Swiss-Prot record:
Statement: the UniProt record of this protein carries the keyword rRNA-binding: no
Induction summary: Induced in the theca layer of the F3 stage ovarian follicle by intravenous injection of LPS. Repressed in the granulosa layer of the F3 stage ovarian follicle by intravenous injection of LPS. Expression in cultured vaginal cells is increased by LPS and S.enteritidis. Expression in the kidney and liver is not affected by intravenous injection of LPS.
Protein name per Swiss-Prot or TrEMBL: Gallinacin-1
Tissue: Strong expression in the bone marrow, lung, testis. Moderate expression in the bursa and intestine. Low expression in the cloaca, gall bladder, brain and pancreas. Expressed in the vagina, ovarian stroma and the theca and granulosa layers of the ovarian follicle.
Species this chain originates from: Gallus gallus (Chicken)
Source lineage: Eukaryota, Metazoa, Chordata, Craniata, Vertebrata
Free-text function comment from the UniProt entry: Has bactericidal activity. Potent activity against E.coli ML-35, L.monocytogenes EGD and C.albicans.
Disulfide links within the chain: 31-59, 38-53, 43-60
Propeptide residues according to the Swiss-Prot or TrEMBL record: 20-25
Amino acid sequence: MRIVYLLLPFILLLAQGAAGSSQALGRKSDCFRKSGFCAFLKCPSLTLISGKCSRFYLCCKRIWG
């Protein structure tokens, strides 16, 4: 019975992590919708950071439109 008390927080922690993982999937399409593009680690020159596509990719937007 003690194992159940130890496993319950672990199961809840896994469920919490799975619930938040779906948020990262829509960010890339949100970036394209804002007429931006995804770049690895830094945006090229003449662009601004307008958000994040994923952990290592930034959403970049051109300065001139």
